[in-house]
UniProtKB/Swiss-Prot annotation:
GO terms for biological process: DNA-templated transcription elongation; intrinsic apoptotic signaling pathway in response to DNA damage by p53 class mediator; negative regulation of intrinsic apoptotic signaling pathway in response to DNA damage by p53 class mediator; neural precursor cell proliferation; positive regulation of DNA-templated transcription, elongation; positive regulation of neural precursor cell proliferation; positive regulation of neurogenesis; positive regulation of stem cell proliferation. Disulfide bonds: none annotated. This is RNA polymerase II elongation factor ELL3. Residues 285-395 form the OCEL domain. Keywords: Nucleus, Transcription, Transcription regulation. Transmembrane segments: none annotated. One of its GO terms (molecular function) is cis-regulatory region sequence-specific DNA binding.
Length: 397
């Protein structure tokens, strides 16, 4: 994806007419964000927007409530060599023929999604729950839920970007204008041709797909069975906790303290290695005592069965812990790029605190599952190494 030529700065405002110093964006948002914008329009309050590169946050304040949303700005995909995406409006006139007006080309796309619960919404919209889509960790990374194929079904509006010195222009803007749907209609006009044979992005083959591919190849049956066995029992994905440091989690002292107290298994510094004293039995992981070198095919089969049992649990924990860890790593990296004391820093700080509080309530067993996931990763790696070592010896003999 191409980089935007220059960063967007200024005040975000809904508009349906051309004006000087404006940029047209394709706005895509879910139902929760749309309801929040409508409530903000009804309350006649000024939204606050903070850009950080091509990402940012949108705060919709109100009397006694506040909503915080995340957004990302990207290039609009153009179909064909000369394809373009234009914003066209139709004016319905009482007298005379209706007219079409091209407001301009849509080069950037701004995707907004509900990122968290903030302060409870006013009673007029409590029944709709402004951030209903953000109650589960699976919805935190929601950008992938929008694609070019569903562009027509998503609400689309023209956005006016007024150049000002402060990216958080909360005092120089105007309130959201009234709804213009009864006066205008908008369409996406895709010029040039449509690519009919576009292939979807292919993911890495799974174990089942590899089995099917192996069966189709003209290889000996023994080789096929060996490959099926290998993919079924020995595919170990990397741990999601590798490279995770306490500095990546900017908020949550309890979380950080818990990480500091974790036992760094199988990691020995030079000072420890130089120590002549041997480690006590309680310091040695149980799987090192239980799983020794393999000397028979029966022992190998037993190890593989244990591997399959623990691997099923590891896959579940890996998905849960990895999603949660990655979210706070990204937030920590974003706040590091902002200078402390600025409005952007305050917006990010509030977002991290609120998301962490909500995360602790929704996922109280995170620490235990994180430890268990790390333990299983080390255990499965150990068993896998023993099996490969035994097979290598047999292959050589």
């Amino acid at each position: 994806m191409e980089e935007l030529q220059e960063p967007l700065r200024g005040q975000l405002r809904l508009c349906f007419t051309q004006a000087a110093r404006t940029s047209l964006l394709l706005l895509r948002l879910n139902d929760a964000a749309l309801r929040a914008l409508q409530e903000c329009q009804r309350q006649q309050v000024r939204p606050v927007i903070a850009f950080q590169g091509h990402r940012g946050y949108l705060r919709l304040p109100g009397p006694g409530w506040s909503c915080l949303f995340s957004f990302i700005v990207s290039q609009c995909c153009q179909e064909g060599a000369g394809g373009s995406l234009d914003l066209v409006c139709q004016r319905f006139l009482r007298s005379g023929p209706n007219s079409l007006h091209c407001l301009g080309s849509l080069r950037e796309r701004l995707i907004i999604w509900a990122a968290m619960d903030s302060i409870p919404a006013p009673s007029s919209v409590q029944g709709h729950n402004l951030t209903e889509d953000a109650r589960h960790p699976e919805s935190w990374q929601n950008t992938g839920g929008y694609s070019e194929g569903d562009a027509v079904s998503q609400p689309q509006m023209a956005l006016e970007e007024v150049s000002v010195s402060d990216p958080l222009a909360s005092n120089q803007g105007q309130s959201l204008p009234g709804s213009s749907r009864e006066h205008m209609a908008q369409w996406e006009v895709r010029s040039q041709t449509h690519v009919p044979n576009r292939e979807p992005v292919q993911a890495l083959p799974s174990s089942a797909s590899r089995k099917r591919l192996d069966k189709k190849r003209s290889v000996p049956v023994a080789t096929v069975e060996l490959e099926e066995k290998r993919f079924r029992t020995l595919p170990l994905v990397p741990s999601p906790l590798q490279g995770l440091t306490n500095q990546d989690l900017q908020e949550g002292e309890d979380w950080e303290q818990e990480d500091e107290d974790m036992d760094p298994r199988l990691e020995h510094s030079s000072s420890v290695q130089e120590d002549s004293e041997s480690p006590s039995p309680e310091d040695i992981p149980d799987y090192l005592l239980q799983y020794r070198a393999i000397h028979s095919a029966e022992q190998q089969h037993a190890y593989e069965q244990d591997f399959e049992t623990d691997y099923a649990e590891y896959r579940i924990l890996h998905a849960r812990v990895g999603t949660a860890s990655q979210r706070f790593i990204e937030l920590g990296a974003e706040i590091k790029r902002v200078r402390r004391g600025t409005p952007e820093y305050k917006v990010l700080e509030d977002k991290i605190i609120q998301e962490y509080k909500k995360f602790r309530k929704q996922y109280p067993s995170y620490r235990e599952e994180k430890r268990r996931c790390e333990y299983l990763h080390q255990k499965l790696s150990h068993i896998k190494g023993l099996i490969l070592e035994f097979e290598e010896k047999n292959r050589g003999s």
